Amino acid sequence: MLAGDALLNYAFETACRSFAMAEEELGVLPRCAKAMTILAQKAGIYGMIGGQTADTEAEELPEEKVTQELLLYIHENKTAALIQSSMMIGAVLAGASDEQLQRLEKIGTCIGLAFQIQDDILDITSSLEVLGKQTGSDLKNHKVTYVSLNGMEHSVKEVRRLSEEAISGLSSIACEKGGAGRNEFLEILVDDLITRKK
C-alpha cells in the first residue's frame, strides 16, 4: 500500500517539477495545469480511488447485487482511469484539442476495460507458474468478475473487440495532420497488454 501511495505522490512531484520548469511561452503553463488536473481527477475519488472504493464495497454485496453497470463503473475507474490519464496528459502537453482528448480518453477506456477483462480471464485460465501470482482467487473469494457475469466466450470476444476499437482509434488520430496513419509501437503495446499471458 505504501508503494502505491509513494508512486502516486511521485507522479504529482514529477508533474509539479515539469510545471515549474515550463517556459513562460503562451499556452505552456495552462497546459501544464490542465495535465495536473487530469492526473488528480483520474487518480482521485472520480477515478482510481473511487473505483477501488467501489470494488471494495462490492465485495461485501451479495453476488446478485453486483450488476454489469456497477462492474463497468469499477473497471472504468479502478483500471482504465490511469491508462486514460497517461494518454491524455501527453496529448495535453503537446497541445491536443479537447475533441482529441475525448477520443484519447475513449481509447484509454477501451484499453483499460480490455486489460481488466483479460486479467479476469487469466485468473481462471492461467497458473501460478505462468502468472506469477495466485490464480483462482476471484472464484475462491466469490468475487463477481466480467467472466462470471458474461461467460468466458463472450469475455474473450469483448477483449478482442475493445482492443480493435482502441487500435482503430489510435490509427484515426495518427492519420490527422499528415500522419502516417499507424503508430506501430502503440498498436503492439496495446496488443501486448491485452493478449498477455501474465
Q: Model features per residue range: what roles?
A:
Residues M1-S171, G179-D191:
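Mg2+-dependent prenyl diphosphate-binding active-site environment of isoprenoid biosynthetic enzymes
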